[in-house]
């Protein structure tokens, strides 16, 4: 009984403790190969509303959540990120990007195309702290129908990646394909994490 209670307390403590951004770091930034020809159809991308965000590496999820909440990472619990984030995105042709989640919060970013790479763009918040979640994002894989994978370098000098989708969940075959792809880029399997939408209001899974 004692050991079971102790385990329960440890699990609870882990769930309510603040985020440790340093422990979520995967590896320093590295170069993303430029496609021989553009792979992302922008008209399709701008038509997807909302964009769900079910798969990414841990550091990306933590930074996106902290930036949306506008809080110190130590004041954001791990459990709130996985159960309350409900992250979605909207992207517009004028460069405006909105992240939404945590029961109605919204954060605005401005993006600019990278001249020599049509599958890349820079992004930073319109106001507030700019060194939490900004940088250059590169589209590395997409079917231009249901998902796209983007990777980039955070201001912390650490590499991040995430998957935008048209639905809250991904088919297993698609997920497998994406995981194989990000590993081939140099990311680590152990740092892959999933965001669940089961408990999100107004989102049908």
State what each model feature region is.
Residues 2-205:
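A beta-rich soluble binding module of mature secreted/lumenal proteins
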């Amino acid at each position: 009984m004692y050991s079971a209670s102790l385990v329960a307390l440890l699990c609870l403590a882990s769930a309510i403790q603040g985020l440790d951004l340093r422990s979520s770091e995967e590896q320093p930034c590295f170069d993303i190969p430029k496609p021989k020809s553009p792979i992302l159809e922008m008209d399709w991308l701008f038509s997807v509303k909302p964009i769900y965000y079910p798969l990414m590496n841990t550091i990306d999820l933590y930074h996106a959540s902290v930036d949306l909440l506008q809080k110190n990472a130590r004041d954001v619990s791990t459990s709130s990120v996985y159960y309350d984030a409900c992250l979605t995105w909207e992207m517009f042709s004028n460069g405006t990007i909105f992240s939404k989640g945590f029961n109605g919060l919204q954060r605005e970013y401005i993006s600019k195309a990278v001249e020599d790479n049509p599958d890349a763009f820079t992004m930073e918040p319109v106001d507030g702290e700019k060194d939490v979640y900004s940088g250059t994002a590169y589209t590395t894989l997409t079917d231009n129908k249901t998902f796209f994978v983007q990777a980039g370098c955070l201001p912390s000098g650490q590499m991040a990646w995430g998957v935008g989708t048209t639905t809250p969940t991904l088919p297993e075959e698609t997920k497998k394909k994406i995981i194989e792809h990000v590993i081939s880029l140099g990311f680590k399997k152990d740092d892959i994490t999933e965001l669940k939408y089961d408990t999100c209001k107004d989102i049908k899974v």
